[in-house]
Amino acid sequence: MRARWALLEAGLSVHWREIELKHKPAEMLQCSAKGTVPVLVLTDGTVIDESEAVMRWALAQADPRGLLQAGEASALIAENDGAFKHHLDRFKYTDRYPGESRDEHRDAGMRILAGWSQRLKEHAWLLGAAISLADAALWPFVRQWRLADPEGFEADGQLAPLREWLNRFLDDPSFERLMQRADPWSSGGLQPMFPADATAVPLDQPLFHLALKGDWEQARETGTYQWSTRGMRLVEVGFIHCSWQEQVAKTFERFYADAGEVLLLEIDPTRLSAPLRADAIPTGELFPHLYGHLPIEAVRGFTPYSSDS
């Protein structure tokens, strides 16, 4: 799950082969003899078959919220992937580990969770004020623990900050996208894309973005524009909200009708280096999203925009 989360975060799309682990296809084992998921095969044939490595690769392509720069995550990830997962497996799947004490592993896991929760008393995220790779790498395992012991997880007073932290991930619209399912893949069969509710953005037509005049003037001084939409920065949202021409009027009415001086930026998508992906909003309509800053040189022109435009 954390690998898919990072692909979503980075604005990437991949061919999706859902694997039935009891019947691993030969094509998977040819790519990675480990026989574990995830396995990411790049266009040059490079194989990445560790979830943390997939996360780091994805965020190296685009990291709009700066997860890789938010702090040193390695120690927490090592604790999660080592000691915590050890106790989680033996607590959740006791029947697979004869002779192991479920209660002992529960107590040990809860001590680790309490330590993480203590961190969250001081800051919103595990490494400080901003979300980091550690948060993204750990939350799916904390969710597994809660599923294994919902009453104990909810009742423990020490875990209140951790529960609030976990719920930020579970309540985010991206969680529903992570939970999308596909039928097990077979050679020659259908190969959907992930995320399933997104599509590529055509590069042969312009994109548009509505910007407050002051924000655009500041961007021209710095060389990059980093606002997602009115009042929300790229680092907060994770992408810059763009529109196709026929969507501009409704976007203006929703976000900018009372905003004062507004400019319509026309963007050349071929001059963008950050990933572009058309994502579905709750109504199902697709909007183009830019998963990185907008360089000034990619803006073909800008004109004042109002409800009369």
Which residue stretches match the model-derived regions?
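Acidic/histidine-enriched, glycine/proline-rich intrinsically disordered or flexible terminal extensions
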Residues: 179-202
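Short amphipathic alpha-helical face segments that pack within enzyme cores
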Residues: 1-5, 140, 247
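GST-like fold's C-terminal all-alpha helical module
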Residues: 76-171
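Conserved, structured core segments of small domains
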Residues: 199-309
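Residue-level recognition of oxygen-bearing side chains
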Residues: 53, 161, 174, 247
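GST-like domain detector, emphasizing the conserved glutathione-binding G-site
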Residues: 1-110, 117
